């Protein structure tokens, strides 16, 4: 009888432990970028909503070389964010505010981009399906698509995702998340 009571007590304890809520896993942010793309059937531009997973974009950034334009494709390269190399805002430009002090500070970008005290933003292609961009592709280089993951040099801190407003040309605008 004692054995049965102990067995019931162990079973109830196990059920209670399994029924306790576990912490929820934080989901990766989804970034939404708007981009005009030409419809091949109508030959007219249409607004497309492109979705990017932040974990994939961060992975793209971490797999990219830590260089400024020194690859076959020229990616990654400096994202000026409206600044010159000395951290002064260029006339008529408004820098994107990322909400992260590493990303928001004015850059220091030496002539070759790898000075001892350099800190600036890099841009690297990112894709909705998360595949890695072939940064060593030469002419014809792989299509980088409309979106870029932005991160810091030299620490590779993720800042955000920006996209061209029309296909792979024009201004880069901050995507929403």
Swiss-Prot record:
Q: Which cysteines are joined by disulfide bonds?
A: 33-175, 103-159
The biological processes this protein is annotated with in GO are: negative regulation of cytoplasmic translation
Location(s) in or outside the cell: Secreted
**Location of the region described as Disordered in the Swiss-Prot/TrEMBL record:** 98-117
Looking up Pfam families in the UniProt record yields:
Ribonuclease
User: Could you say which enzyme class this protein belongs to?
Assistant: hydrolase
Q: Does Secreted count among this protein's keywords?
A: yes
Keywords in alphabetical order, please. Disulfide bond, Hydrolase, Nuclease, Protein synthesis inhibitor, Secreted, Signal
Q: Where is the composition biased (Basic and acidic residues)?
A: 102-117
Where is the signal peptide, in residue numbers? Answer: 1-27
- Name the UniProt record assigns to this protein: Ribonuclease clavin
Its source organism is Aspergillus clavatus
């Amino acid at each position: 009888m004692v054995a049965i009571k102990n067995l019931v007590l162990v079973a109830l304890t196990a059920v209670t432990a399994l029924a306790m809520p576990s912490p929820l896993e934080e989901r990766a942010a989804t970034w939404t970028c708007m981009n005009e793309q030409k419809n091949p059937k109508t030959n007219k531009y249409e607004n497309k909503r492109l979705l990017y997973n932040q974990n994939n974009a961060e992975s793209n950034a971490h797999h990219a070389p830590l260089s400024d334009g020194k690859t076959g494709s020229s990616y990654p390269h400096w994202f000026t964010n409206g600044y010159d190399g000395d951290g002064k805002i260029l006339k008529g430009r408004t820098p994107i505010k990322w909400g992260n002090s590493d990303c928001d500070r004015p850059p220091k970008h030496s002539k070759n981009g790898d000075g001892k005290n350099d800190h600036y933003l890099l841009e690297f292609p990112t894709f909705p399906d998360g595949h890695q961009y072939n940064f060593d592709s030469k002419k014809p280089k792989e299509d980088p698509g409309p979106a870029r993951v932005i991160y810091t040099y030299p620490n590779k801190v993720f800042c955000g995702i920006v996209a061209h407003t029309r296909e792979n040309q024009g201004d880069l605008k901050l995507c929403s998340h």
